[in-house]
């Protein structure tokens, strides 16, 4: 099975990526996670991207806040799918990171999820890998069904409360 390569610009992004890793683990998807900065450790970030295929990564997830150039720097050095997670920083409620992540030049795409969207990044990575993995696709289908059942259970409880 292909792995997901995860990289964050700073350990301050770790709480968001823990949700990513937990979601991947719940779907039995192997992953590898590193802290590499587009600005402070550009060679390591570049090498991580350049070696994505060799390291059996089916896709990459890059999370960063503020200037948030990491996902773009990763995407510039691989043709594997890259998912960007813009992280809330100290100002602008993450809008600076969102715009830095989503506004990529033509030819260097980054699929971008919501600010702090670690769970959706993991689910998108799972969907990318599931294109070539029927067992993973079945696990994703089961998760969707379980999530739907949880919502319907909450609705039933609400209806019971309102109809008393």
Walk through the language-model features, giving the residues of each.
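Glycine-rich phosphate-binding loop
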Residues: 48-86
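N-terminal beta-loop-helix "entrance" segment that forms/cooperates
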Residues: 33-54
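Glycine/small-residue-rich loop that forms an oxyanion/phosphate-binding "nest" at active or ligand-binding sites
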Residues: 77-106
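Glycine/charged-rich beta-loop-alpha catalytic/anionic-binding loops adjacent to active sites
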Residues: 2, 29-32, 79-81, 102-110
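Acidic, glycine/proline-rich low-complexity segments that act as flexible tails and inter-domain linkers
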Residues: 33, 43, 66, 158-164
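C-terminal binding/interaction regions
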Residues: 8-15, 19-20, 95-164
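Short glycine/serine/threonine-rich phosphate/pyrophosphate-binding segments
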Residues: 13-17, 42-45, 64-73, 92-95, ...
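Glycine-rich phosphate/diphosphate-binding loop of Rossmann-like nucleotide-binding domains
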Residues: 2-40
């Amino acid at each position: 099975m292909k792995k997901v390569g995860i990289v964050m610009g700073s350990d301050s992004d770790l709480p968001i990526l823990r949700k990513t890793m937990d979601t991947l683990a719940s779907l039995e998807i192997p992953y590898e996670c590193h802290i590499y900065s587009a600005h402070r450790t550009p060679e390591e970030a570049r090498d991580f991207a350049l070696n994505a295929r060799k390291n059996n990564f089916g896709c990459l997830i890059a999370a960063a806040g503020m200037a948030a150039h990491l996902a773009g720097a990763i995407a510039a050095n691989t043709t594997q799918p890259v998912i960007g997670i813009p992280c809330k920083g100290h100002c602008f409620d993450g809008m600076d990171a969102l715009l830095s992540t989503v506004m990529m030049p033509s030819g260097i795409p980054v699929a971008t999820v919501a600010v702090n969207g670690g769970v959706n990044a993991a689910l998108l990575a799972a969907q990318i890998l599931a294109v070539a993995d029927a067992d993973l696709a079945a696990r994703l289908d089961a998760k969707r069904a379980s999530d739907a059942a949880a919502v319907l259970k909450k609705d039933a409880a609400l209806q019971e409360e309102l109809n008393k």
